[in-house]
Curated annotation (Swiss-Prot):
Species this chain originates from: Aspergillus aculeatus (strain ATCC 16872 / CBS 172.66 / WB 5094)
CDD domains noted in UniProt: GST_N_EF1Bgamma
Primary enzyme class: transferase
EC number assigned by the record: 2.5.1.-
GO biological process entries: translational elongation
Record-given protein name: Glutathione S-transferase-like protein
The keyword Transferase is annotated on this UniProt entry: yes
Domain GST N-terminal: 1-76
């Protein structure tokens, strides 16, 4: 399953005509604990980024995405063309991480066999994700926005939220649920279908009926 945290980085790179060298395979749990890795990235976290000249080393996917977005000709569109847009981009990136991604993980991981089912965790995640999607739906409804923070062009926050929802649309946001958030669905398909972005996200995978726990 594609790493949802790096899709936004790869998409920002594609829009900036940048090439990322991603080592394959990467032995998570081993390679990121090696002395060589920890010398560059003391936290041992992944994803991790090193610039081609070795001068920049970063962890945390949002920081890496910010650096990549700022490193090419698409930077003004991706990061905002004025202070107000830049602040709005940052606001919605925080929202995507705090209100969407963590709740998405709570409802998706057990459905793909990466975590044991916990009714409490799943319930809280479902409630949180539903509330977050309702916020985005209301926001998009004002003026029938095409994108979250910028006028007429996608920004880094569109890539970030689409990344956070990638697994959710694949495994949790089923046909019935999509019917309650039509603007969010249209926005998502618009973003992942954008030129160069679709090369990263691929053909949208939308679950018909989500898996439910056996009781």
């Amino acid at each position: 399953m594609p790493n949802a945290r790096i899709l936004k980085i790869q998409a920002a790179a594609a829009l900036n005509n940048l090439t990322l060298d991603i080592p394959q395979p990467f032995a998570f749990g081993t390679a990121n604990k090696s002395p060589e890795f920890l010398q560059k990235f003391p936290t041992g976290k992944v994803p991790a980024f090193e610039s081609s000249d070795g001068e920049v080393t970063l962890v945390e996917s949002d920081a890496i995405a910010q650096y990549v977005a700022a490193s090419g000709p698409a930077a003004p569109a991706l990061l905002g063309r004025n202070v107000a847009e830049q602040a709005a981009v940052r606001q919605w990136i925080c929202f995507a991480e705090n209100e969407v991604f963590r709740n998405m993980m709570a409802v998706v991981l057990w459905r793909v066999g990466m975590r044991e089912y916990d009714a409490g965790v799943d319930g809280e995640g479902a409630k949180g994700l539903e509330e977050a999607l309702a916020v985005v739906e209301r926001h998009l409804a004002v003026g029938e926005k095409e994108f979250l923070a910028t006028e007429g062009e996608l920004s880094l926050v569109d890539l970030t939220l689409a990344s956070a929802l990638f697994w959710a649309f694949m495994h949790y946001i089923d046909e019935e649920m999509r019917g309650r958030f039509p603007r969010v669905v249209r926005w998502y398909l618009r973003v992942v279908g954008a030129e160069r972005v679709r090369e990263v996200f691929g053909e949208p995978s939308l679950v018909a009926v989500r898996k439910e726990a056996s009781v």
